[in-house]
């Protein structure tokens, strides 16, 4: 029977209204969640293509189904572009997410119960870097490294000392809430000193790496994992890279048949579009603007003694702010800013004293506002609006002023221009 529901707006009004409301929210909110970005219409078009109909277990030219000659072309394009973008010999574009990419990397390199040294969640790590509530912490024996208590930056000498003490089989470098550059060459040196593998999770900084604005981990790590959204500005998904042929075979087997069945070829097509966009010289300009906007916004907080900028600054697309001098915790700050249409997230800070459900800090990222075309002036304005909201959170008339200014900014920089 043929479909008679070509227009989902008419067929499923409930769903259409929810999606329309989300479109309006994105259009009229200032998005500062560091793990979010705004993709191009080309990325969305590829993801919404007929490729969603096709099952394709296996890899290009080695499928378990017929009729895959065209998805082979699509996936091969994505693979070759990813390799070129990051200077890698091998790439796997099938992971459905960064978490699954990390799981595959672990499966490829180590065994259940092995000791792993990874960044502590409170210091800026990710759930998949050994949190006890995550599969990583349940499957492997993770030991967390942290940052220096005074500088709030990575202390490579201390990490080396810790690595020698615990003798891990794997060291994980990379973070989800660390605002400074990470020296992957130093991490490889540490790994070699103890005979460990090095895995780098570059999910947050992949776009900056692609643009040549952060050290590329591929020459140093045994495996590099990433998401394809965040600063890379692609669809939500994962990526694996390596220069080692034997490890490439293991990581491919870990994804399929180890963790996943059929790949999402429509998402892989969208990844291919995003990789092509990132190979364009204009993407480097975008990444430079992200860093400049983040630095400009962070500087406003650094100059206000009512707030504390974690580590004193930022080198990438995000930074953390301790807000406890002006408001009880990060959870309340997040909720208040939601009320004025500024979206960010509460976040633990190094050596956190509050519950992870409350936190002392907030995390701010500038990738999404940069995608809208906002610059350093707008970034400073947004920082002042955040401060104005948190300092005057008990004054409704002030909050209304902030809402007006937020709407003025979003109207001036529309997300997707209407045809």
Curated annotation (Swiss-Prot):
The record's listing under PANTHER family reads: SERINE HYDROXYMETHYLTRANSFERASE, SERINE HYDROXYMETHYLTRANSFERASE 1
Species in which this protein is naturally found: Streptococcus equi subsp. zooepidemicus (strain MGCS10565)
Specify the enzyme's EC class, one word: transferase
Q: Which gene encodes it?
A: glyA
Q: Which reaction does it catalyse?
A: (6R)-5,10-methylene-5,6,7,8-tetrahydrofolate + glycine + H2O = (6S)-5,6,7,8-tetrahydrofolate + L-serine
The function of this protein is: Catalyzes the reversible interconversion of serine and glycine with tetrahydrofolate (THF) serving as the one-carbon carrier. This reaction serves as the major source of one-carbon groups required for the biosynthesis of purines, thymidylate, methionine, and other important biomolecules. Also exhibits THF-independent aldolase activity toward beta-hydroxyamino acids, producing glycine and aldehydes, via a retro-aldol mechanism.
The organism's lineage is: Bacteria, Bacillati, Bacillota, Bacilli, Lactobacillales
What EC number(s) does this enzyme carry?
2.1.2.1
Instruction: Give a GO biological-process term.
Output: glycine biosynthetic process from serine
Gene3D superfamilies in the record: Aspartate Aminotransferase, domain 1, Type I PLP-dependent aspartate aminotransferase-like (Major domain)
Classification via Pfam families: SHMT
Kindly report the protein's main subcellular placement as a broad class: cytoplasm
Name used for this protein in its record: Serine hydroxymethyltransferase
Q: Can you list the GO cellular component terms from the UniProt entry?
A: cytosol
Please report which protein family the annotation says this sequence is part of.
Belongs to the SHMT family.
Q: How does it assemble?
A: Homodimer.
* UniProt modified residues of type N6-(pyridoxal phosphate)lysine: 230
Could you say which residues are annotated as the site Plays an important role in substrate specificity? 229
Q: Which UniProt keywords apply?
A: Amino-acid biosynthesis, Cytoplasm, One-carbon metabolism, Pyridoxal phosphate, Transferase
């Amino acid at each position: 029977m043929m479909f008679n529901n070509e227009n989902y707006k008419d067929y499923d009004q409930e769903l259409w209204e929810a999606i329309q409301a989300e479109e309006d929210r994105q259009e009229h909110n200032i998005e500062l969640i560091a793990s979010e970005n705004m993709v191009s219409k080309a990325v969305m078009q590829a993801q919404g293509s007929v490729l969603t109909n096709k099952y394709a277990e296996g890899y290009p030219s080695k499928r378990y189904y017929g009729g895959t000659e065209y998805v082979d072309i699509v996936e091969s394009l994505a693979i070759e572009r990813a390799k070129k973008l990051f200077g890698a010999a091998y790439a796997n574009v099938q992971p459905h997410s960064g978490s699954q990419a990390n799981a595959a990397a672990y499966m490829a390199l180590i065994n259940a119960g092995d000791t792993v040294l990874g960044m502590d969640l409170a210091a800026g790590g990710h759930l998949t870097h050994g949190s006890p509530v995550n599969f990583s912490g349940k499957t492997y024996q993770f030991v967390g490294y942290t940052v220096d208590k005074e500088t709030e930056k990575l202390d490579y000498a201390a990490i080396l000392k810790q690595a020698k003490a615990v003798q891990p089989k794997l060291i994980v470098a990379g973070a989800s809430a660390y605002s400074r550059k990470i020296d992957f060459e130093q991490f490889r040196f540490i790994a070699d000193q103890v005979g460990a593998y090095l895995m780098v999770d570059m999910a947050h900084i992949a776009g900056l790496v692609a643009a040549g604005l952060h050290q590329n981990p591929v020459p140093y790590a045994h495996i590099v994992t990433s998401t394809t959204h965040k600063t890379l500005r692609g669809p939500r998904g994962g990526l694996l890279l390596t220069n080692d042929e034997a490890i490439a075979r293991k990581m491919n087997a870990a994804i399929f048949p180890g963790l996943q069945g059929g790949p999402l070829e429509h998402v892989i097509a969208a990844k291919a579009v995003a990789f092509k966009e990132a190979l364009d010289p204009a993407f480097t300009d975008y990444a430079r603007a992200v860093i400049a906007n983040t630095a400009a916004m962070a500087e406003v907080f650094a100059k206000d003694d009512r707030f504390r900028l974690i580590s004193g600054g930022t080198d990438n697309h995000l930074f953390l702010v301790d807000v406890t001098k002006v408001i009880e915790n990060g959870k309340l700050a997040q909720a208040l800013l939601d009320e004025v249409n500024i979206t960010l997230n509460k976040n633990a800070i190094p050596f956190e004293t509050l519950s992870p459900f409350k936190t002392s800090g907030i995390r701010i990222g500038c990738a999404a506002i940069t995608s809208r075309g906002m610059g350093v002036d707008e970034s400073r304005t947004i920082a002042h609006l955040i401060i104005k909201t948190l300092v005057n959170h008990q004054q409704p008339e002030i909050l209304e002023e902030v809402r007006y200014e937020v709407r003025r900014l979003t109207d001036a920089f529309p997300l997707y221009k209407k045809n």
